[in-house]
């Protein structure tokens, strides 16, 4: 009953509170913003350290409206619709249709909705929790008392090349068809509110006993540990969030800040097989050092409580987008995807973004930026541990740089190379890390 009353109160606030308009584009960027409908898109020919060489296409359709529109100077676009077909040589598929409409039909609401099919036959599972994250990679062999430990991921690969029975020891397979709908509303000039729902069916399989390159695989780490979620199932959850946003332009900020809190709840009333909650907070800050040079900073924290399946532990549930962590191009570059996972995770990122060139041709605007970054993150077992037992010496660090291209300001393509003491990573993908 209390949950029902709380939901009703939240919905009443959501639909009745008034606001004024959001942060405005600079005059320089406003002059570059084109009017009306236009397409963009790229063939997806890229490489990712976790997923191998990828190929496919992502096509965008934008509508910016006209300069006379009330929200032209405030919204990143009037509508963004994209469709994606993508698969890789390492067995990853991600196909999606996504629609984003800020100030939909001239109202103060925004909707983001997506339907996606996500399949991976080499998803990573390195264990979970603080002890696992701060220890060495450990491979338990077929004998219960025997194990191998590795200082780096490359050391493990060298071992597995010699004993191919363990090539898939840290891998498993999943399929995740999903749908989500997020509805946002401005409360004040910069304060925004979110309610949303995600529905996802997860199917899990292991490599144990199957053949890879003709070699039968030994029992994998996932099968040895059999964490909650090992059998897959429905993972449905509702979301609510509130954030304060003064950024000048959401896809590619140069100034301003974002303070964000989001709450997620999953239980059987939503048709979920799991009962858990998640709290996530983040701060983003953008400081223009020079006209063409921006310092971008982010700090994030997330905590999951209850019966959280292992495949949901590795997420930061930010209001505008959920990000996998810790590892790969969305949180901790220089490490494998979801290399460090636990109930409580922290992340911090610093980037320098320098626009060194700009070109205009056939009515299209292209901006080219060099970026240098430094990332850190850690895993904890309890919500208060980052503050009461921070273990600063255990923070994992990654660094590197790359190229970012902004196409008509709204379509962001990045080329990152990240390094760490354990591994390196390459990423060619859309959007900034933050």
What residue ranges belong to the model's regions?
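Membrane-embedded beta-strand positions of outer-membrane beta-barrel proteins
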Residues: 41-43, 81-83, 111-115, 195, ...
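Extracellular loop and loop/strand-boundary signature of outer-membrane beta-barrel proteins
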Residues: 83-85, 164-169, 223-229, 265-271, ...
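Hydrophobic, lipid-facing positions within transmembrane beta-strands of outer-membrane proteins
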Residues: 39-41, 55-57, 93-97, 175-181, ...
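Structural signature of outer-membrane beta-barrel channels/translocons
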Residues: 46, 62-64, 100-104, 184-188, ...
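C-terminal outer-membrane beta-barrel translocator/porin domains of Gram-negative envelope proteins
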Residues: 222, 228, 235-243, 247-362
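Gram-negative/organellar outer-membrane beta-barrel architecture
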Residues: 30-41, 45-228, 234, 330, ...
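Sequence/structural signature of outer-membrane beta-barrel proteins
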Residues: 62-66, 86-90, 104, 118-122, ...
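Short loop/turn motifs that connect adjacent beta-strands in outer-membrane beta-barrel proteins
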Residues: 23-38, 65-78, 104-111, 188-193, ...
């Amino acid at each position: 009953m209390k949950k029902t009353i709380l939901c009703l109160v939240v919905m009443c606030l959501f639909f009745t509170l008034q606001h004024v308009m959001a942060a405005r584009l600079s005059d320089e960027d406003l002059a570059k913003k084109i009017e009306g409908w236009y397409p963009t898109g790229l063939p997806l020919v890229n490489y990712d350290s976790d997923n191998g060489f990828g190929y496919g296409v992502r096509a965008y359709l934008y509508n910016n409206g006209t300069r006379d529109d009330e929200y032209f100077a405030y919204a990143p676009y009037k509508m963004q619709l994209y469709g994606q077909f993508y698969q890789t040589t390492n067995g990853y598929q991600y196909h999606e249709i996504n629609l984003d409409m800020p100030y939909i039909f001239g109202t103060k609401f925004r909707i983001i909705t997506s339907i996606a099919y996500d399949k991976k036959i080499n998803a990573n599972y390195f264990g979970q929790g603080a002890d696992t994250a701060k220890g060495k990679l450990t491979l338990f062999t077929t004998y219960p008392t025997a194990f191998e430990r590795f200082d780096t991921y490359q050391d493990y690969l060298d071992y597995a090349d010699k004993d191919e029975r363990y090539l898939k020891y840290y891998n498993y397979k999943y399929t995740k068809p999903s749908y989500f709908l997020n509805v946002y509303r401005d409360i004040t000039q910069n304060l925004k509110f979110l309610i949303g729902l995600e529905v996802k069916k997860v199917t899990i399989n292991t490599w144990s006993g199957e053949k890879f390159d003709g070699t039968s695989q030994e029992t994998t780490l996932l099968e040895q540990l059999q964490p909650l979620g090992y059998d897959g199932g429905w993972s449905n959850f509702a979301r609510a969030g509130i954030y304060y946003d003064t950024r000048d332009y959401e896809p590619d900020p140069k100034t301003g800040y974002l303070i964000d809190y989001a709450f997620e709840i999953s239980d059987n009333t939503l048709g979920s097989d799991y009962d858990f909650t998640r709290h996530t907070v983040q701060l983003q800050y953008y400081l223009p050092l020079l006209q063409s040079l921006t310092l971008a900073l982010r700090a994030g924290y997330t905590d999951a409580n209850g019966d959280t399946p292992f495949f949901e532990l590795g997420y930061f549930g930010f209001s505008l987008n959920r990000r996998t962590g810790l590892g790969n191009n969305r949180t901790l570059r220089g490490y494998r995807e979801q290399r460090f996972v636990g109930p409580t995770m922290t992340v911090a990122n610093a980037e320098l973004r320098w626009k060194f060139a700009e070109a205009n041709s056939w009515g299209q605007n292209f901006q080219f930026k060099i970026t240098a970054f430094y990332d850190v993150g850690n895993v904890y077992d309890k919500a208060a541990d980052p503050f009461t037992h921070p273990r600063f010496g255990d923070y994992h660090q990654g660094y590197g740089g790359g190229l970012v291209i902004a196409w008509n300001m709204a379509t962001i393509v990045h080329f990152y190379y990240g390094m760490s003491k354990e591994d390196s990573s390459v990423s060619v993908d859309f959007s900034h890390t933050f």
